[in-house]
Each structure stands twice: as structure tokens, then as C-alpha cells.
Amino acid sequence: MSFLDDNNACGQNLLNIVSVGNSIIAEILRLKDYVPSIYRLDNKADKAKYGELILDFSYFKIAEDHERRIEQSPELTELDDEARAQLPLITRFYLAFQSIHHYASDLQQYIEELNTGYYIQQTLETVLQEEEGRQLLCESLYLFGVILLMVDFHIPGDVRERLLIAYYRYSGGDATPSGDESNIHDVCLLLRSTGYVHPSIAAKVLGLGGKQAGARAASLVVPRYPEAYFSRFRFDENFVDLVVARLRCDDIYNQLNLYPHPAHRSTALSTQAAMLYVCLYFCPQVLHSQGSQMREIVDKFFCDNWTISVYMGMTVNLVDAWLDFKAARSAIENVISPPAIKALCQQQKEQLGKITQKTQEIVREGVLNDNFVLEHANKIIHLMRQSNVLLRWFCLHTSREVFIFAHTATLTGQVQKCVLHELQFNRNTLYNLLLNCSQMELSVREFLAEIQQTKEERWTKSREEAMQRLNELSEAFAGSRPLSKIEQNPQLQQWFGEVAGRLQKLELSRPQKSGRLIIQVMQALDDVQEYHNLHSNMLVKQQLQETRDMLNQMAQLINLKEDIEIHIQMITDFSYAWHLLQFDFTPPMQEHIKRQPQAVIGIRAVFLKLASTLEVPLMRINQARSEDLVSVSNYYSTELANFLRRVLQIVPETMFSILAKIIYLLTNVIKEFPTKVEKERLKDYAQFEERAKVAQLTNSIAVFTKGILMMKTTLVGVIELDPKQLLEDGIRKELVNHLANAYNLGLIFTPEKGKTPVQLLQQKLQALAKTIEGYRRSFEYIEDYLRVQGLRILLEESQRIINYNVEKECNAFLRNKVQEFQSEHQSQIIPIPNFPPLLGDPSNNFIGRLAHEILRCTDPKQTIFLDLKSTWYEKKAPHQEVLAGSGFFEILREALAPAGMVGLERLYAHMLADELKRNLERLQRNLTSDRMWVDTLAALTRELEARDFPTPEVSKQPLKYYQAYTQRWLKVWPTLLDWVLCIGQKQLLRREIAGELSFSSKCDAKLLENTADTLNKALLLELSLSKDLCDEKGVVMLTELQETLLYTGNFEPLEQVFLITKNTHNMALFMFLFTIAHLGRMQHSTITDCLLPKSAKDNIDNVPFIVGLVTILQQFHKNVKMLYISYMSQYVVTVSEAQLLDKEILGPEVVTALHFLLAFIRIARLPLGVLEQRIPNIILSEYEYLSTLLK
């Protein structure tokens, strides 16, 4: 029974453990990009905001005090709730950390089971005697070491501690989501911070300099690393010793058979060498003191190389890694001595020139075909082996290692400088070898695959043709076939007939017998030709040569083994370049494409070479038939596909640099043809030279397009990449970068001398509109040459950028924030760039800056809004126009498109919701809890609702009566007024945005606007009659329709309800008192026919004041609004009666109140009948006459 048979529990359990190890590594690599920024605390803003809340393991010492501090601080409580919202993501991190500990525990348990005889007839020694068992046992220990290194490299120790503490605090730490008991204590002990610093952070620290440079450099040194880290989990010593011994002495993967040349020994054992390197950290005494063993290891595995790939391109330099290990350091120093390096580099340099030339000759067009591959298969594989060995050595030893242990050590750098100097290294030479090697491998694989598929057919065809020629010769020597000058020869007739008969019996399924017979026949043909002097007749000689060719082809087909492709796969391993290719070869690739767009064909071969390495992490997962296969293969394939996109991004980048020139010419130089033009003026629009320049630039773009489209559809892992889609994605990505940059730079509002904020705002918007129009015209012009739908792409991407930035800006008002990876507008393939906020600016991005700038320009404290003209004016005389609503919002739409208008509206809506929530909660709390408020309002309610109100005392001086109540909140009114005006201002802006969207949609998208409006009315009618639309499908449809209605401006901002409130009549009464307390600060203007502040210095503005009140009351039941109007009407009637009885004339208080009420019901869209029911008609209709003094 095989070790990996399904019935062999011992083998299957070990295979599953190793499979899980590979899956854990993929999960760590996947999660490293999703660490929430607040747990990194790598900038001052996050440290200041979350530093007190998010702690590392120091939390355990002050847990109770920490929790008490959070409970006592509302700010910390709110931040804690915000951080708690990320628990699902934190849980995934914890499960990944826990799986690391589970992996080690499962492996330890498996070893114990082997030692205790749990598996029948299986012990540690017998498993190591099995080929598969030996490989898997070594891999199991090696993978745990790789996991530890990977997690420490990609997720820093302090970040791990903060994530573990967050999980402990927010989940309780007692159980995992699956219901298993949590072992968080063991996980914390294993993954606590080691002190290791990532190379990128270490480089920044070392680059700072200054007085404390020495101290900072010392902080980067981690003693006994990674020895102490690996010792946190103890495995059975015998198991570790046996694994290290097998790795040291055996060829566990039988690689030496594939690399027979002694110079290739270190490459043959490279995978085993990496495993041995990791496993030695589990028995550090060998590294420290076993000098003879270390010399043996170095002589066998590292005699000509000192940089190794540990796992999927995670490279390590042994000079750096073994610096703190005496025996290991001593052993490796022999390899890196200057004479040894010089000799080795000289040899490799010579080989590089020879192999590059050979591969160049092979990949030259017209050389490689199926017959060439069939004939020279062994020579080609030998060349592949040589070129890959050379490629591996140069890639690893001319690049900086990925994992750096000693950041302050100088020896590593000295060795690399020496190598580069001796090699006189040129990266482009190595790049050419890589290209040749990749193209050769791809072509040979394709030909071999084709040959293997048609092998039976080729064999049969060759045999039939050989038999046919032999039969023809037999007939010719019989005299029945009249070939010129051939004498009849019965013996040759019989012999050729017998040979043809023997060939008939050949079978491809019996290669040894058939091969021997073919060789015998070929030898016999040579002997016959020589003996009978048949070469004197050219026709016979030609027949015999063609027969030999057919037989030779049959022999080649027999010799072509089925496992040849597996051998090629193994000798062309490129997994060591997973990281190096991105760091070192991206610039040469992009420069190559820039010079020759058709170079993408060769670069495709490079990526297919790299894609073949996905077998390394997937092999064991696939063998175990694990469910993780899809997710792991998808991760690596996505990473590789994204890398290919990054390399090919040079094509869109170059296109856009050319397109920028076209944009300039089309926008600023070339005149747009009018619909009609006079014949005499036609020359003015010709502009031959400028149009020739545009044509030349357009041709350059077309060449790049053609180049990338020459690349075939490519399967990268499990992801298929279509060149047309790659081109479109690249164009989208570059367009997104340009548009995002244009929005970001175009909407920075720095004060300029001689310009008001409004002038600067309009100027910026007009400039931005011109830029966007330039892109529109250019894409409209160029889309046919790019073979994409340019205008659709421009519309979709600009809309996505705006929606993404609106979402980010709105996050400030959300407790459960939308994370970067959760955003439906963000994309891994076409990412929207993030720009840092401006210093001292409360906004997060350009949409927030624009929203705040518009608010600044329309501040009710500085401006007056005239509703009839939709225009803002200065409060100070001479009341100049500040911002004309119709003209300004048209400019805004041209600059940001409808998507930007809708985005602004959404942002203002979020601001309103946040302000209403905070202030209404506080207001309602006071209305229900504050003794003075409750008692005063209760007393006033009883008096106002009494049957005998107004009493004689009130009737004499009603204003004094009301004033007595309003003065009780004198300290509250200023704050409340600012809030109401702020709400009114934002609602006014939302209303103006809706108006502009409605107007533009009626002009530019009349059919859409009409259709959406009709559907909306139909659905409203349907909802009023039944609840059929309240199911899931109905809600989805209503949501989609709401989105369309926003874009067509078919919505009423003042009717929107932002939050759920408790209804109370006290709210109506309080808002009534607030209103009458401020009416005296306004007066009616006959010029503008509206209320204006009496003083230019007064902060109040009538329309925002009313709109703010309407919005607040809209959050309650409509009865609250009606009650508010009733109180206001009662106030008007009461004061009117008193004034008419006293002076027979209405005072300004009543007139102002009536103008206010009429404006209120108009803005609130209420019928006039609401007032007619509450105020006598004589007052309502004749108040202007009744307030006029008669002479």
C-alpha cells in the first residue's frame, strides 16, 4: 500500500497537515494588505486619535483601568464603538493566527502518535524510509518555520499584539466563531512581538540621521533572532534531528537525476537547501557550534551560492542570516572570500555570454518548429537546464534579498558590491536571457504538447509512408513499376517486401521492441544500399533516404517520453523570482515595451514562465483534495495577473502622455467646427500643420494599441487575461489617475489677493470643467484608434472616482465606516488613488473641500439668500451679488457632471443627519429631563391651551407675556440659531442642486426624466394601495429607482426624514418660542418682498432660518408641525387683538410674524388653508392695510 493511499491514515493525516501549512501562508499573504490603518498607528493623526484606545500586550497589566477610562470618556467610547465595528475583519486575523498554533499542535500530536504506535506498523523511522513520507515530514517542519518568518515579515509584532488585544476585548476571547474553545493565551505567547523591523521601515529609520542615529540603529538589532522566536514552540528533538539529518544527507526529491552535471548540483538541491536552512533554526546548536557539520552543509548545498529562495521568492542572504551563528558564519565565509567570488563570477560571466547567444539562435524566427523540437529534444532540454541554472544564480546574487536580518551589517553589502563589480553586471543582459529563455520554453512546450496529442497519428502516418516507399521499391525491382534504369532483381524485390511487412507489425504501445526493429531496419537499409550499389540510381537513393527519414521520425517519437514535460517543468522552476521580478525587471520590461510595443509577446512568455511556479504552493493542497485549493490558487493567480497589469501599464501611461499633447491641441489650438461656417472663413478652421501633428500623435497611439492586442489570450494560473480587456483596464487605470489628480489639484482653495472666495471658487470650477471637457473631446476623438468605448469609460470612471471620494468623506459621519476593501467603488485592478488631506483642512478629499468652500461662500452670517432669485447677496451695503444659484450650479455641473452634484447632495445629507442626530438628541434630553425646561413648558402649555386664554392681563400686554418666557432661554438661543441656520443653509444647497439636476435632465435626458418620473408616480400609487413592493425584489427596484431619481433631480430635500424621533408637543412649543424670540430681528422689505435682518451685522437670514425650522420639524410627526403653526397663529391673533384694541393698527411684530408664516407654509409646501383655519381672514388678507398708519 502506497504511503498516500486514501486508506493510509498515517499518510493522509500528514498530507493534510502540510496542505494546511501552504493554505496558512496564502492566508497570511492575503491578509497583509488588509490590516486596518488604526492598528498600525504609523502616522501622527492615528496615534493622537487612537493611541489611548488601541494597546499592545501592555493592556494586560492595566486592563481594568483601561476599560474604566473608556467607559468614563464619551469620546473614547465612541472611538471604541468605531473600532468594534471592524470585529469581523479582526476575527479573520485572529483565526489566521490561531491556525498557526493549531498547525504546530497538530504536527506535534502527529509525531507523538507515531512515537506511541498509534499507526499500525508505522514509526517515525519507517515514515522517513518512505519517499513521500520523507518529503512530507521534512516539509511539515519547514512550513512551520516559513509561516513564522512570513507572519513576522508581513505583519509586524506590535500590529499583531494590537489585533490580538482587539479580538480579546471585543469578542470576549472565550470562543471562536466556529464555537471551539479559544486558546488565545497560547496564540499570544507564540505570536507576541519579536522586535523584528521590516526592511522598508528600517531603511527610513537609518535614513533619518541626527544625534540619535546610533540609538535608532541599535533599536533595529534583535538578539537571538530568529532562534528565540522558533523556540517558542518545542517539537520532539528526535523528530527535528531526523528531519535535519535526512535533509542534510539525502536527495529527498530525486533532483540529481535531472541535473547530471556536477556544476549544477547546488541548483538541483536548491529546494532541499532552503528547507534545511529553515529547519536548522529548530536545532540552533548546529549553527552555533557544529563546525564540521556546517562545513559539510555549505560544501554540499552552498558551495557556489549564498542567496536562497525560502518560499515563493522570499529570498535570504546566508551572509546576513548566519551572522550571529559562529559555526555557520565560519563555514559560509569560505565561499564569499574575494578570490572565490572572483573565480566564480568570471566563470558565470563567460557562461552568460555563451548561453545568451545560444538561446538567441534558438528563438530566432523560423528556427523552432515541431520537427526541430522532435529531432533536438535532448539538446534543447540541456540548453534549458543550463540557461535556467545561470538565470537563477544571476537573479539571486545580483539583487537585494527580500528578508533582511541584520539591518546595520555591512558585510552583505560588501559581498554584493564585489559580485556586481566582478561581473560588470548589466541588468539588460540578464533581461535578454530571461526573454530568450522564456520564449524558448513556451514554444517548446507548445510544440511538445501538440506532438504528444498527435503522437499516434504522426507515428501511423510515418509508418505508412515508410511502408509505401518500401513497397514501391519492391515493385520497381520486380519490374512491374517502370522506374528508369532499374534492373529486375527478385531478391531485392522479396527483401523490400519482407521489410515492409515487418514494419506493418510495429506498434507504438511497445516502444522497446519497435525501437529495436526500427534501428535494425535503418541499419539493413544502409547495408543493402552499400552492398548492391543502389546509391548509383538517384531515384532509388531518394526513396531510401525518404524511408530512413520516416523511420528516424518514428524512432524520435518513440524516444519522446511522456514525462518530458514534467522534467521541463522542474528544471524551469522560476518561483525564486516571485518578488525579484517585480523589483528588478519591471523597469527593463517597460522600457522594452516603450521602444517596441510588440515586445508584449515576449513578456507574455515571461509571465507564463512565472505562472508555472504556482504548482509549488498548490501541489500538496491539490493532493489532499482540500477545499482551500480554489482560494489559494485564486490568490496567487490574482497577484500574478496584477503584476502583469502593472508591467503593461506603461502602454496606457505612454498613450496618455501622447494624449495630453492631443488634448492640448484639441482644447487650445484646433478650433471646433461650428454647425455652419461661411466659405470665406473655411481656411481659418483648416489648420493643416496642427491637424497633421494630431494625426501623427494619433498614429503613435494606434501603434501601441496594435502592440498590446498582438498578445494572445493568456491563462495566468486560474485567471484568463484577454489583451483587449487588459488594454481597457490599463486605459481606465491611467484615466482614473489623471482624473483623480485633476480633481484633487483643481479643487484646492488657497486665498489669492484681489479675488473673493466666490471668484476663486468659480475660477477653479471653470478651469476644472475645461480640463474635463478636454478629456471628453480627446476620448471622443481617439476611441476608435484605441478600440474602446472612450466616452462610456470616461463617464463610468469619473462617476466612480466621485462616488468613492464621497463615500470616504461620509465616513466621518458614520460609526460603521466603509473600509477601503469593502467599498463597491474601489477596485484592485483599477484602484482609485488616495491623496493625503491638506494640512489643517477638516476635509478628507476634494469633494469635502468643495462642499466646505461652498458653505463658506454661502454662510448665512455673511450673506442674504433671496428665494425668488435663488441668489446669495452680501449683507453689507451695497449688497453685491455673491453667488447666483442658476449660473453657479451650472458651472458646478459642467465641472463635476451630475455624479458630482449627486455626490455633494449626499455629503450634505450626511452632514445634516449627523448634526440633527447630535443636536436633536441633546434637545430632546433637555425637553424631557431638565427640570426648568419641563416645568416652564408645562406651565406655558396649560396657559396657552386654557379656554380663557388670553386672560385680561395677557390681552393688555401679550408681547411682554411671551417675552417673559423667551428670556428664560437667552443663553440657549445663540447656539440654537447657529444650528438652525447651518441646517437651513445645507438644505438650501441641496434644493438648488436638485433644481439644477432637474433642469439639465429635462434638457439633456428628457426621455429618462419622463420615464423615471412616470415610474415613480406609478410605484407611489401602488404602495398606497398595497404592500406588494415591500418584499426583497421590490426594495431593490425602489432603491435603483431612487438612484435614478437623484440623478434627474426628482426629489425634495425638505421632505426627507433623517432620523427616528420621539414625538412631543414640547418640541413644537419650544421651537415656537425660539421663533418669536428671533422674529424681532427681521423686517419685511418691499423691494425684495421678503424678510431681511434689521442690521447688516446680525447673523440671522430669513430663508435658511425657515428652511432649518422646516427640516427640524420634518423629523417629527406632521402633527408637531401643525401644532407649531397653531402656536404661531395663536401668537399672531393674540398680539393682533391687543394692538388693534389699543392703537387700532397692527405693529411690526404681527406683520413680521405673518410674512414669516406665509413664507413658512410656502417653503414647507403646505396649503394656505392651514393658516386660514387658524387666523381670521381679515388679518390674513388685510394685514398690510391694517398695519398702515392713517393720517
UniProtKB/Swiss-Prot annotation:
Protein name per Swiss-Prot or TrEMBL: WASH complex subunit homolog 5
UniProt family annotation: Belongs to the strumpellin family.
Pfam assignment, any one: Strumpellin
GO-annotated cellular components: early endosome; endosome; nucleoplasm; WASH complex
Subunit relationships: Component of the WASH complex.
GO biological process, one term: endosome fission
Keyword terms: Endosome, Protein transport, Transport
Gene: Strump
Subcellular location per the Swiss-Prot or TrEMBL entry: Early endosome
Function, as annotated: Acts at least in part as component of the WASH complex which may regulate wash nucleation-promoting factor (NPF) activity and is required for its membrane targeting during endosomal sorting. During embryogenesis, not involved in the wash-dependent developmental migration of hemocytes anteriorly from the tail.
Disulphide bridges: none
